[in-house]
Amino acid sequence: MRSRTHRNPDEARAARHYRLRGYRVLGSNVWLGGYELDLIVRRGRRLVFCEVKGKTGSGFGDPLEMVDAEKLRRLERAAEVWLARNPACLELDCRFEVVAVRPGGLERIAV
């Protein structure tokens, strides 16, 4: 399992958003074999696995449109692998969120 610092400004912005709301960043750009978790954050008993999608301009649709059923399946599988390697977190309340980073702001959607 590898975790890197934020290599992309959208992920750094999303991490800052969570930190300002009292979350602790447990990992960013975490690679687990063929799976990646953009952000893993925790606040109290809530553990959130985040997929971050950014958009810099007005073309090419909404960032949320970039997350399809296959991407959600891979996110779920990555979370399963991460939890298996971090059994102390198995009792936490887990959720998945897609974070859409746009020029005017940021939107979190629970999936």
Please name every model-derived segment.
Residues M1-V30:
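Acidic-basic catalytic patches of nuclease active cores, encompassing PD-(D/E)XK
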Residues V25-G27, F49, F96:
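Hydrophobic residues on conserved beta-strands that form the core of alpha/beta folds
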Residues L32-Y35:
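Short acidic/glycine-enriched loop/turn segments that link adjacent beta-strands
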Residues L37-P63, V67, L75:
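Conserved catalytic cores of phosphodiester-cleaving nucleases, focusing on short active-site segments
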Residues M66-P87:
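Short, charged, amphipathic alpha-helix that recurs within catalytic cores of restriction-modification
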Residues R85-V111:
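Domain-level recognition of nuclease-like catalytic cores that cleave nucleotide substrates
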